[in-house]
C-alpha cells in the first residue's frame, strides 16, 4: 500500500523562512515533576581521623614524644649512669589557604526558570569542598606510606608504615572477585598484626578501598554469610568490620585534593595522590588496593570551618552563593598507616 500523501506535520510547518529537522519541535515539553540532581557524595574521612581547630595562626604543632626503657639498679650504682633521654620532635600541619566554590544566579534566568536550583546548587558547593577534604586526607595517608626509609618514623623505634602486597592464588586469578576478596582479607590479617606490633590501639582502625574491592570482599564472605552475621549484611550488601578494621568503600579513593583551578585535572593540585608506583613510590594510583589506618594517622587543622555566604551582585543583577573553608591536612603517625597494593606485573 502506498504511503499517504498530505496530513499535518506541525513541527515541520513553521511558517515562511522557517524550517526544523525535528517534527516534534513545536509540541510542549511538560515538566516531569522531578529534577534529576546529581547523586549525593558523602565524606568518609571526617569522622575517622583527627580534627583540631585553631583560632588564629598559619599552622598547628603536634609534639611527638618517644619511649624509654627500664633497667635494674644494683647496689652502689648511680641512676645518672643509666638514664636514657626521651626523644622529642614535632609534626606541623599548615593551613592550605582559603578553599572556595561558588555559583552566580542571574535574576532573569531565575525568573524564567520553573524549578528551584538554589537548594541543589548549595548542596553541590558544599559537597565539592567535602570531596576536596576527603581526597586530601586520603592522599596524605598514601604520603605517609610512601615516606623514604630515612624519615619513615617520627622517632626511631616508634614504628614504620606497612606496605602489603596481594598474593596471587595458586589456582584462579585476582581478576575473579572471590579470589580477590580472599586475598584482601588475608592481607588485612597481616595488617592487623602490623599495627598491633606498633602498639596502635585496636579501636578506630579503618580500611579504605574502592567499590570494586569492597564488593570483592563481600563476594569472598558471602558463601559463609551465615557464619559471618557480625561482619556483613548480605541483604544490604554492606560490611561492618573485617579483622578489626571498619571497611569503607570510597569511589574517590585516589582523587586527591583541590588545586588552583576547578577542572577535572586541577592545576597545582595540593595533596595529589601519587600517579605511578616505583621503587621509591610504594603506593600509587596504578597499584593501590586500599589504605588502612588508625584515626590518629592523619590530622586536619581548621582555621575557618565550612561556611556558606550569599551575596547580592547588583552590577550583574545576580545572586552569588559561596562555599568556603580554610583547613590544612597532614600525616601525623607513620606507624599507624599502611596500604595493600597489587603485585607487580612481573610477579
UniProtKB/Swiss-Prot annotation:
GO biological processes: viral translational frameshifting
Keyword field contains Ribosomal protein: no
Record keywords, A-Z: Capsid protein, Virion
Keyword set includes Zinc: no
Domain of life of the organism encoding this protein: Viruses
The family this protein is said to belong to: Belongs to the T7virus major capsid protein family.
GO cellular component: viral capsid
Organism ancestry: Viruses, Duplodnaviria, Heunggongvirae, Uroviricota, Caudoviricetes
Domain remark in the UniProt entry: The N-terminus interacts with an internal region of the major capsid protein subunit in an adjacent capsomere (intercapsomeric interactions) to stabilize the capsid.
Protein name: Major capsid protein
Function: Assembles with the minor capsid protein to form an icosahedral capsid with a T=7 symmetry, about 60 nm in diameter, and consisting of 415 capsid proteins. The major and minor capsid proteins are incorporated into the capsid in about a 90/10 ratio respectively. Once the capsid formed, encapsidates one single copy of the viral genome.
Subunit and partners: Homohexamer. Interacts with the connector protein and the minor capsid protein. Interacts with the capsid assembly scaffolding protein; capsid proteins and scaffolding proteins form building blocks that assemble to form the procapsid, each hexamer of the major capsid protein interacting with 2 scaffolding proteins.
Pfam family, one: Gp10A-like
Localization: Virion
InterPro entries linked to this entry: Capsid_Gp10A/Gp10B-like_dom (IPR049301), Capsid_Gp10A/Gp10B_dom (IPR039009)
Amino acid at each position: 500500500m502506498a504511503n499517504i500523501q498530505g496530513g499535518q506535520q506541525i513541527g515541520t510547518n513553521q511558517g515562511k523562512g522557517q524550517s526544523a529537522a525535528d517534527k516534534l519541535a513545536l509540541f510542549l515539553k511538560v515538566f516531569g515533576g522531578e529534577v534529576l540532581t546529581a547523586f549525593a557524595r558523602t565524606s568518609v574521612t571526617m569522622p575517622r581521623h583527627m580534627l583540631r581547630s585553631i583560632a588564629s595562626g598559619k599552622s598547628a604543632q603536634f609534639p611527638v614524644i618517644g619511649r624509654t626503657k627500664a633497667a635494674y639498679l644494683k647496689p652502689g650504682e648511680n641512676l645518672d649512669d643509666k638514664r636514657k633521654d626521651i626523644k622529642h620532635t614535632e609534626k606541623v600541619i599548615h593551613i592550605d589557604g582559603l578553599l572556595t566554590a561558588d555559583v552566580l544566579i542571574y535574576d532573569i534566568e531565575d525568573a524564567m526558570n520553573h524549578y528551584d536550583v538554589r537548594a541543589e546548587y548549595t548542596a553541590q558547593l558544599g559537597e565539592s569542598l567535602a570531596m576536596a577534604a576527603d581526597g586530601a586526607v586520603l592522599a596524605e595517608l598514601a604520603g605517609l606510606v610512601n615516606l623514604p626509609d630515612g624519615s619513615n618514623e617520627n622517632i626511631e623505634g616508634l614504628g614504620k608504615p606497612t606496605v602489603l602486597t596481594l598474593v596471587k592464588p595458586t589456582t584462579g586469578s585476582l581478576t575473579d572477585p572471590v579470589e580477590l576478596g580472599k586475598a584482601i582479607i588475608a592481607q588485612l590479617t597481616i595488617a592487623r598484626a602490623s599495627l598491633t606490633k606498633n602498639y596502635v590501639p585496636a579501636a578506630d582502625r579503618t580500611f579504605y578501598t574502592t567499590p570494586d574491592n569492597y564488593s570483592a570482599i563481600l563476594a569472598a564472605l558471602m558463601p559463609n554469610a551465615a557464619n559471618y552475621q557480625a561482619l556483613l549484611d548480605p541483604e544490604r550488601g554492606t560490611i561492618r568490620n573485617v579483622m578489626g578494621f571498619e571497611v569503607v568503600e570510597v569511589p574517590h579513593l585516589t582523587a586527591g585534593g583541590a588545586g588552583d583551578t576547578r577542572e577535572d585535572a586541577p592545576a597545582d593540585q595540593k595533596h595529589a595522590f601519587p600517579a605511578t608506583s616505583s621503587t621509591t613510590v610504594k603506593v600509587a594510583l596504578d597499584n593501590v588496593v586500599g589504605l588502612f589506618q588508625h584515626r590518629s594517622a592523619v590530622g586536619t587543622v581548621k582555621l575557618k570551618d565550612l561556611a556558606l555566604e550569599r551575596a547580592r551582585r547588583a552590577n550583574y543583577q545576580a545572586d552569588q552563593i559561596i562555599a568556603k573553608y580554610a583547613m590544612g591536612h597532614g600525616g601525623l603517625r607513620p606507624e599507624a598507616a599502611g596500604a595493600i597494593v597489587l603485585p607487580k606485573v612481573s610477579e
